UniProtKB/Swiss-Prot annotation:
Record keyword RNA-binding present: yes
GO BP annotation list: rRNA catabolic process; rRNA processing; tRNA processing
One Pfam family named in its UniProt record: RNase_PH_C
NCBIfam families: RNasePH (TIGR01966)
Organism: Rhodopseudomonas palustris (strain BisB5)
Protein name in UniProt: Ribonuclease PH
EC number: 2.7.7.56
Keywords assigned: Nucleotidyltransferase, RNA-binding, rRNA processing, Transferase, tRNA processing, tRNA-binding
Binding positions (phosphate): R86, G124, T125, R126
Length: 237
């Protein structure tokens, strides 16, 4: 039995609320159960120096957690003077995931910066961030399209992410913190709307996992991503 009493293939309650920030070109408040992330997408008429003159744009991401997003206060990284390795890893993952489904040529010579700020953390902050980031990005691109700043299709597909793990010997979908901290194996899957894989991160926390167990986790992830993509489409409709 899972601590949350969910079925092995059951997501937490998921919500994606678009257009929640007045000033941002795109935004989304994403909730995976008690994990809440505010995502904004900002259009910037500038590019990294190494991209200038190439006729294409860029999508990048930043990620951070509010001090009381966690049970005990976490010191702000700005106060510490540097980002920790986990933060850098996650924001690079978010950026890679979004660029995989964006036509950077169609975007033109401009940059969209996606900021993911964790308001409350209960496991799966990176997967929630990626899923909400797609909605915020779509919101931003819609804003641009209404102003004739872009033409054609910039977003080539959806992208969503979900965690899976082996908890008490059973493959389960969408781990919360209680499960993640006790799981024998945990993995994150980033997938497109048509089921292609962008990235897989998997770790055996206690004992190695078999190929069959990995395939069971991937099947769960595909089911979860399909549901998340449906929710994304509803959010931007």
């Amino acid at each position: 039995m899972r601590p949350s009493r969910r079925a092995p293939d059951e997501l937490r309650a998921v919500s994606l609320e678009r257009g929640v920030v007045k000033y941002a070109e795109g935004s989304c408040l994403v909730k995976f159960g008690d994990t809440h992330v505010l995502v904004t997408a900002t259009l910037e008429e500038r590019l990294p120096p190494w991209l200038k003159g190439q006729g294409r744009g860029w999508v990048t991401a930043e990620y951070g957690m509010l001090p009381r997003a966690t049970l005990e206060r976490t010191r702000r990284e700005a106060a510490a003077g540097k980002q920790n390795g986990r933060t850098v890893e996650i924001q690079r993952l978010i950026g890679r995931s979004l660029r995989a489904i964006v036509d950077l040529q169609a975007l033109g010579e401009r940059q969209i910066t996606v900021d993911c700020d964790v308001l409350q953390a209960d496991g799966g902050t990176r997967t929630a961030s990626i899923t909400g980031a797609w909605v915020a990005l779509a919101d931003c691109l819609g804003w641009m399209k209404t102003r004739n700043m872009i033409k054609g299709t910039v977003l080539r597909d959806n992208v969503a992410a979900i965690s899976c793990g082996i908890y008490n010997g059973t493959p389960v979908l969408d781990l919360d913190y209680a499960e993640d901290s006790e799981a024998e194996t945990d993995a994150n899957f980033v997938m497109t709307g048509d089921g292609r894989i962008i990235e897989v991160q998997g770790t055996a926390e206690k004992t190695p996992f078999s190929q069959d167990e990995f395939l069971a986790l991937m099947a769960l992830a595909q089911k979860g991503v399909t549901r998340l993509v449906d929710l994304q489409k509803m959010a931007v409709a």
